[in-house]
């Protein structure tokens, strides 16, 4: 988060190397560090731009990837792209200079604001994905058919608005303090460092963990219930001499032993001579004047023009049967939802692990600097945890796309086209 630019009581360039040691920037040690920062920065910027650009292009060109859930991935990729374009070049420049800020203070303030907003947006997008997956598991059918696009747009809009709100104080003159050193680019207000750290990490991180835990538990309960239903389906089927048949609109009556000329009695007709369960076949039934395609009207339907007691047979069948989704369609829909969420469940440990690995050290170090001015934090540690936080922007495309078979196929097509 932009908190990499956190205030440093010991004169450290928050997340950008030792500001107090700018005078020694020409030394051999700092020159070597500057060269390493330049090479590492170029590689990191290239990885972030390539990975996240490929994500955006894949979703824009591949219709199969244009799903509501992937809109969060595009928003996350956009935040990381802006970070690589607007923040990382200036960060690398400062690292190459040994931590000294040789540009204007206004540009420093703009860098701080962009850093805070874009890094906060990146983490908030991760939280939005966790919210979306939790909803997909909690109410899967409703998730697919009710207000999906609107929900995603609201979450993405809230992500960017909240990120801008966290960064707004920097643009409103928070860094304009007396005695400000123009050679140091950092956040000057320790209270703001605590505020931005809490809003950007210490609140959304537990929320994301809680939602992922609830998602994982919900998927486990879903899987247990599905297996129990599959195993318990056979005993509930009716037993009989013949194989079970799919449920028809009307119950099937057993065949009469009288022979092929015997049919089950129609309602209201006398029993046939063959037996109590048999009536003469269709020829003994009175012919309807409207023809063979006429059937008695169903309750609640208007009479057919050909007669007061006649209605089209299709209308009768439609009225007699309650509206139902075919069992095959329901099974396919459940299988599709279950398969998608199984993939999400397999990715969850990778998502949470990478997030915590990249961001926890950074926020622990920088909030410690803000809350404990007397604590001495090595400049190299500050720089290392800052780099680690930025690396998360390069890992996001790997986590959210390489583990997805559809994205993998699109990436292969793109690489083959380029090669």
Curated annotation (Swiss-Prot):
Subcellular location: Cell membrane
Residues annotated as glycosylated: 3
Disulphide connectivity of cysteines: 108-185, 372-375
Binding site for (2R,3R)-nemonapride: 115, 196
GO molecular function, one term: dopamine neurotransmitter receptor activity, coupled via Gi/Go
InterPro entries: Dopamine_D4_rcpt (IPR002185), Dopamine_rcpt (IPR000929), GPCR_Rhodpsn (IPR000276), GPCR_Rhodpsn_7TM (IPR017452)
Regulation: Signaling in response to agonists such as dopamine, epinephrine and norepinephrine is modulated by Na(+); lower Na(+) levels result in higher receptor activity (in vitro).
Region Disordered, annotated ranges: 230-264, 317-336
Covalent lipid adducts (S-palmitoyl cysteine), residues: 419
Biased composition annotated in UniProt, kind: Pro residues: 238-254
Keywords per UniProt: Biological rhythms, Cell membrane, Disulfide bond, G-protein coupled receptor, Glycoprotein, Lipoprotein, Membrane, Metal-binding, Palmitate, Receptor, Repeat, Sodium, Transducer, Transmembrane, Transmembrane helix, Ubl conjugation
Membrane topology category: Multi-pass membrane protein
Residue ranges annotated as Cytoplasmic topological domain: 51-71, 132-152, 214-346, 404-419
Family matches, as SMART domains: 7TM_GPCR_Srsx
Domain of life: Eukaryota
Pfam families xref list: 7tm_1
Protein's name according to its UniProt entry: D(4) dopamine receptor
Species this protein is from: Homo sapiens (Human)
Lineage: Eukaryota, Metazoa, Chordata, Craniata, Vertebrata
Name of encoding gene: DRD4
């Amino acid at each position: 988060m932009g908190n990499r630019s956190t205030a440093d009581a010991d004169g450290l360039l928050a997340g950008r190397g030792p500001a107090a040691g700018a005078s020694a920037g020409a030394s051999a040690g700092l020159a070597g560090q500057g060269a390493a920062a330049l090479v590492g920065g170029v590689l990191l910027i290239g990885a972030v731009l390539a990975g996240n650009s490929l994500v955006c292009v894949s979703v824009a060109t591949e219709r199969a990837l244009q799903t509501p859930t992937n809109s969060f991935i595009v928003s996350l990729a956009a935040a990381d792209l802006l970070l690589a374009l607007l923040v990382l070049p200036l960060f690398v420049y400062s690292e190459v200079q040994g931590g000294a800020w040789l540009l204007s203070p206004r540009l420093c303030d703009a860098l701080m604001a962009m850093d805070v907003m874009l890094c906060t947006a990146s983490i908030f997008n991760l939280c939005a994905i966790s919210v979306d997956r939790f909803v997909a598991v909690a109410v899967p059918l409703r998730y697919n058919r009710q207000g999906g696009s609107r929900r995603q747009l609201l979450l993405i809009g809230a992500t960017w608005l909240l990120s801008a709100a966290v960064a707004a104080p920097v643009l409103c003159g928070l860094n304009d303090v007396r005695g400000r050193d123009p050679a140091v680019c950092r956040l000057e207000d320790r209270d703001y460092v605590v505020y931005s750290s809490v809003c950007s990490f210490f609140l959304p991180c537990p929320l994301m963990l809680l939602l992922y835990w609830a998602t994982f538990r919900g998927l486990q309960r879903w899987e247990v219930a599905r297996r129990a239903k599959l195993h318990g389906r056979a005993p509930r089927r009716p037993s009989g001499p013949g194989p079970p048949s799919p449920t028809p609109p009307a119950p099937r009556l057993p065949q009469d032993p009288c022979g092929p000329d015997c049919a089950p009695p129609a309602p209201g007709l006398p029993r046939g001579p063959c037996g109590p369960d048999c009536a003469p076949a269709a020829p003994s039934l009175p012919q309807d004047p409207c023809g063979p395609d006429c059937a008695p009207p169903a309750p609640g339907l208007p009479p057919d023009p050909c007669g007061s007691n006649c209605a089209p047979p299709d209308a009768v069948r439609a009225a007699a049967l309650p509206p139902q989704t075919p069992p095959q369609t329901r099974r396919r829909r459940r299988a599709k939802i279950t398969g998608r969420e199984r993939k999400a469940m397999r990715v969850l440990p990778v998502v949470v692990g990478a997030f915590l690995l990249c961001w926890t050290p950074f926020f622990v170090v920088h909030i410690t600097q803000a809350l404990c001015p007397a604590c001495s934090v090595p400049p190299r540690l500050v720089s290392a945890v800052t780099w680690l936080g930025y690396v998360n922007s390069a890992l996001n495309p790997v986590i959210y796309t390489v583990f997805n078979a559809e994205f993998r196929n699109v990436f292969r097509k793109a690489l083959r086209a380029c090669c």
